[in-house]
Curated annotation (Swiss-Prot):
Pfam families the UniProt entry points to: IF-2B
InterPro entries registered for this protein in UniProt: IF-2B-related, IF-M1Pi, IF_2B-like_C, Initiation_fac_2B_a/b/d, M1Pi_N, NagB/RpiA_transferase-like
Species name: Thermotoga petrophila (strain ATCC BAA-488 / DSM 13995 / JCM 10881 / RKU-1)
Lineage: Bacteria, Thermotogati, Thermotogota, Thermotogae, Thermotogales
Biochemical pathway: Amino-acid biosynthesis; L-methionine biosynthesis via salvage pathway; L-methionine from S-methyl-5-thio-alpha-D-ribose 1-phosphate: step 1/6
Protein name per Swiss-Prot or TrEMBL: Methylthioribose-1-phosphate isomerase
HAMAP family: Salvage_MtnA
Amino acid sequence: MKLKTKTMEWSGDSLKLLDQRKLPFIEEYVECKTHEEVAHAIKEMIVRGAPAIGVTAAFGYVLGLRDYKTGSLTDWMKQVKETLARTRPTAVNLFWALNRMEKVFFENVDRENLFEILENEALKMAYEDIEVNKAIGKNGAQLIKDGSTILTHCNAGALATVDYGTALGVIRAAMESGKRIRVFADETRPYLQGARLTAWELMKDGIEVYVITDNMAGWLMKKGLIDAVVVGADRIALNGDTANKIGTYSLAVLAKRNNIPFYVAAPVSTIDPTIKSGEEIPIEERRPEEVTHCGGNRIAPEGVKVLNPAFDVTENTLITAIITEKGVIRPPFEENIKKILGV
């Protein structure tokens, strides 16, 4: 079986990933033939976005089986999982996908067609992601009024998933239902996912989009130019606290101050029932060069100290609702999240 979307392409013996570091100027795919190459692609943000990372890791696990040569197969596959798992610590979909693949592996370890079984599980996961995103979009579109201007942060679109997107999936679904929507995409320093990816993606779809700098959002809210904020998520705690791209917390505070609804759009797989609150979510610290350089050019003095957390945590009191494929979760979040999860 094969898979081909804008984000990724699986041919049966390799995984091609759209190199999102080079967008919007160059559309180029990186071919991964080993699990180490997949791990490198995740770590270096060739592919990014929690759902996309999860499915990519699943295919990496499949390639890991092909990479096996001698010794204990179970020990080898544990090593494959560890290699993929340590690439990005915050996005829970990565660990969810790898745990799911490992379970299938141990259930079928003695089968002759083990590679095919694992490949089918990864493909199933990929196609499930598309359907889940469309369900998120349908549920979220009901919250968006005709003529709305939506502010979104980072990129939670087709590029962050297998296809369609979570936050941008809500916008797509609203448009498909006949509503007129305008989007403000903040640039999202330091990696500029909003300016580079979200703007590119929405323009491809013919959706009206404006790029704004990150520090414009509060003023635009105060002037009444923003009707709702819709963002994605990398990990959601049991109480609804949400880790997402750095800068999300600031937008949530500003939205609360200006009485603007703040929505998180994410699959149920992004909810981590082992994490009680946002204080327990690990935050990835990335390289200083991502802050001191832009487009390969230095923009800060040599030797300056840098902080570069990739994510922040928005507490549940700032969130209006969490939009999932199983429905819209409103406060009290912990109680209603447990109902959705069946725990």
